[in-house]
Amino acid sequence: MKLAVIGGDGIGPEVTAEALKVLNAVRDDIETTDYDLGARRYLKNGELLTDEDLASLREHDAILLGAIGAPGSVPPGILERGLLLKMRFALDHHVNLRPSKLYDGVESPLRNPGKIDFVVVREGTEGAYTGNGGAIRVGTAHEIANETSVNTRYGAERVIRYAFELAQSRRKKLTLVHKTNVLVHGGGLWQRTVDEVAKEYPEVAVDYNHIDAATIYLITDPSRFDVIVTDNLFGDILTDEAGAVSGGIGLAASGNIDATGTNPSMFEPVHGSAPDIAGQGIADPTAAILSAAMLLRHLGDEDNAVRIETAIAADVAGRDNSQPISTTEVGDRIVKALQS
């Protein structure tokens, strides 16, 4: 397995090291290439992501990312647009996959959360984040600005098919989230596509929620969901809420996936670079390790993905949450569990 590793900034390299430790405990064929991408490189020479970087990344089977960001040193938006979004579009990461699971031993902010175990499939390369917009008369009382949400049948269908395949392998329920009563053109495209693709998956139950209703149900009845499929903007909102109800983003992993396999997909923890605790050895690497499990599953290694997830579930359930986290100790415990 040829693995591109982007440790990134802050705690990113620390948690990524533990994810690699766990990967090497279950596989002996991993060949890694480290990439200096993120705030450190940008502050040093102004580079974000070059064509040479992209060409080199494409030579790998997958990408493991730690975290990107340097609040206070790099203005907001520069790394997001110039590195993360550029990589997403260049490598056609059209599926953003975000599992949400409440583990035993983890406290949800919800009083009676029930069983939380669902996945959000978010479209990643269209919608309101394509940069299709503009502004005139900026800074005046007559300023006009617009952002156009771009939706194509091709883009929506490939994500919807991915979601149906996922639902078929899980509890066989798919929920489309949109705002079709107001966004009649883009929403209509998504609804029609779901209705048509659903005919090929008769065993999958399909329902629909408006985005406002879905945000409520994630709080009041999260166990109703199995697989949620939605567009880029609504998915951005739902995935962060999903992380919150399942105990916080410290346990949230994600995948940015080219479902065709043409380009390497990227897997990362959802949390940020947390520069305030970087270098102290107290960052929780669990989300990074879960990202590594997602990476293995994407590459067809289901057995080892399940082994890692099982070890994590047992470790999380047995933690003394009154004691501080040790980054390396968490990785060591997971490795020990895998080797026992």
Swiss-Prot record:
One of its GO terms (molecular function) is magnesium ion binding. It is found in: Cytoplasm. The record marks 129, 179 as: Important for catalysis. It is an enzyme of class 1 (oxidoreductase). The keyword Plastid does not apply. The keyword Transcription does not apply. It catalyses: (2R,3S)-3-isopropylmalate + NAD(+) = 4-methyl-2-oxopentanoate + CO2 + NADH. Keywords: Amino-acid biosynthesis, Branched-chain amino acid biosynthesis, Cytoplasm, Leucine biosynthesis, Magnesium, Manganese, Metal-binding, NAD, Oxidoreductase. It comes from the Bacteria. Pathway: Amino-acid biosynthesis; L-leucine biosynthesis; L-leucine from 3-methyl-2-oxobutanoate: step 3/4. Substrate binds at residues 88, 98, 122, 212. Homodimer. Belongs to the isocitrate and isopropylmalate dehydrogenases family. LeuB type 2 subfamily. Catalyzes the oxidation of 3-carboxy-2-hydroxy-4-methylpentanoate (3-isopropylmalate) to 3-carboxy-4-methyl-2-oxopentanoate. The product decarboxylates to 4-methyl-2 oxopentanoate. This is 3-isopropylmalate dehydrogenase. It comes from Corynebacterium glutamicum (strain R). The gene is leuB.
